[in-house]
């Protein structure tokens, strides 16, 4: 990633874009590897689960 030759404002925008992409990827990975397993752990049997818009959780009895 050589920055020489780029305009003054260009490198700033590039850096912000890269940071934004990394944050989005981290958020997606956090969602899939941390949040989804937690949602699934809440209910072990199908009859104990309530599913709403694709997110399942333990029925509140």
Swiss-Prot record:
Transmembrane segments: 16-36
Inducing factors: Expressed in the late phase of the viral replicative cycle.
Record's subcellular location: Virion membrane
Assigned keywords, A-Z: Disulfide bond, Late protein, Membrane, Transmembrane, Transmembrane helix, Viral envelope protein, Virion
GO CC entries: membrane; viral envelope; virion membrane
Post-translational modification comment from the UniProt entry: Not glycosylated.
Keyword flag ATP-binding: no
Membrane topology qualifier: Single-pass membrane protein
Presence of keyword Chaperone: no
Entry's family note: Belongs to the asfivirus inner membrane protein p12 family.
Binding partners and assembly: Homomultimer; disulfide-linked.
Name the record gives this protein: Inner membrane protein p12
């Amino acid at each position: 990633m050589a920055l020489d030759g780029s305009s003054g404002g260009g490198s700033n925008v590039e850096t912000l874009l890269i940071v934004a992409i990394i944050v989005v990827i981290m958020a997606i990975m956090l969602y899939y590897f941390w949040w989804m397993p937690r949602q699934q752990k809440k209910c072990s049997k199908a009859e104990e689960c309530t599913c709403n818009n694709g997110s399942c959780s333990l029925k509140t009895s």
